[in-house]
Regions:
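Terminal low-complexity "docking" segments
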Residues: 1-121
Length: 121
């Protein structure tokens, strides 16, 4: 069985067995959540509740990234389109999502709140 494009790229970059996640800018690539579901990998929006429903088609998502999956094959077909970043961490999907949710807003010097698109590659 030959190596997938993901395995070729990450042969030296990824720790053996370390979980990978994609942080995807769905405003840039709206089919990412659908692609994840089709591949059977977990996918969660960074927004929740009413805001999550309102922004579901453009909200950033955290997606599990198994190296040998239809999702990773699709991801590498998008290479160069700046749709997101990959993260290697021993944390769970829920923990990764919780962490990135803390970075979603910033305040200016007058304490006004703004969305921060930190996930925009």
């Amino acid at each position: 069985m030959s190596a997938s494009p993901a395995e070729v790229v990450f042969d030296r970059a990824v720790s053996p067995g370390a979980p990978l996640f994609a942080l995807v800018d769905v405003a840039r690539e709206s089919s990412a959540p659908h692609q994840a579901r089709q591949a059977g990998v977990a996918c969660e929006s960074l927004f929740a509740g009413e805001m999550g429903e309102l922004l579901k088609d453009v909200a950033p998502h955290v997606i599990e990234f198994p190296l040998r999956s239809r999702f990773s094959e699709w991801w590498f077909q998008q290479w160069g389109n700046s749709i997101g970043v990959l993260i290697e961490t021993p944390a769970s999907l829920a923990d990764v999502r919780r962490h990135f949710r803390t970075l979603m807003t910033v305040r200016d010097d007058q304490h006004r709140k703004y969305f921060f698109r930190f996930y925009d590659p």
